[in-house]
Amino acid sequence: DFRDNTFDLVYSWGVIHHSPNTPEAVSEIFRILKPGGQAKIMIYHKWSIVGFMLWFRYGLLALNPRLSLADVYSQQLESPGTKAYSITEAHALFDDFSDVRITTLLTHADLLTSRAGQRHEGFLLTLARKIWPRRFLKFAFSRAGLFMLIDARKG
């Protein structure tokens, strides 16, 4: 346990969306930051290309189109219970902070430019890697990246 108002900076890259209680983790970050301290956090973005790809494969093609994105992320992306948030939901998570800035970032996973997602290997992923419209996605869906970067200050 850290005392209140201890740190000038808290940095977390892809961690708190795996915790059982993400809002509690954000509250703890707020508590341990000094006034004026900065939080730099990355959590997963719900409305990402990765989320759509996983829903397409494990929802639509599995004849389960009602499968929620929450279930897709929880069951198919990394570890069980993984969560992803909309920008609105992220703002609500960081409501106690002042000067909250949120941006999304297209990743190698959104653009299928790496071997990430090996557990999903198969014909569909192999084909998608060959025909994936990367330039179009970068242009038309630049805000649909998996990574949501949050820069927040404790007022």
Regions found by a protein language model. Give the residues of each.
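A short SAM/SAH-binding and catalytic strip from SAM-dependent methyltransferases
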Residues: 8-21
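Conserved class I S-adenosyl-L-methionine
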Residues: 38-67
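A C-terminal cap/extension of S-adenosyl-L-methionine-dependent methyltransferases
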Residues: 57-61, 67-72, 78-83, 87-92, ...
